[in-house]
Amino acid sequence: KEKASEKCARAYANKCLARFPRGMVMLLLDGIRTEVNAKCNGSAAGHQEYLKHSSCMNNHGAKLHQCMRDLTQVLDQSVDAPTKSRLGLSCCSFNTYKTCMTGAVREPCGSGTAAYVDKLITGYAGDLLDTVCINFKAGTDACKTLPVLPKSTKTGRSASLLSPLARIVTSLNG
């Protein structure tokens, strides 16, 4: 299922995005591909690690999905923020997302699962975040001084992270 989703996302990026946003989305998709291959290859160490943590993560999936919905909603809203704040809001929201995800599993599943979730997110998005978000690290003044987005009553325009991420990167390019 994850591989089919990745294939669809790559087709969307190739067909619908200009060069710069396509490159940024592909960077994220490359990270996702690496992590998916590691956990789905039965002979890889990543597979055993995934199996070790997956049951508890599945039991607390509602919290994890809420973290993703919150991230998607913030990215959707960030597109409408002033241009100079968009990148920072997006980057800092990834920091909040990572904290949400690890927090969702730390107590019920243990610190090992929280570390695994942190590692997964870094594997998925680390190259993109290191490239684009270099000036917006967790807890820095750069994140603390950004405008606060108004609390939205919408459930979000997007069901997936790809579309708002592509809109953010496209809006930065022109």
Locate predicted features:
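Mature extracellular/luminal domains of secreted and GPI-anchored eukaryotic proteins, especially small
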Residues: 1-174
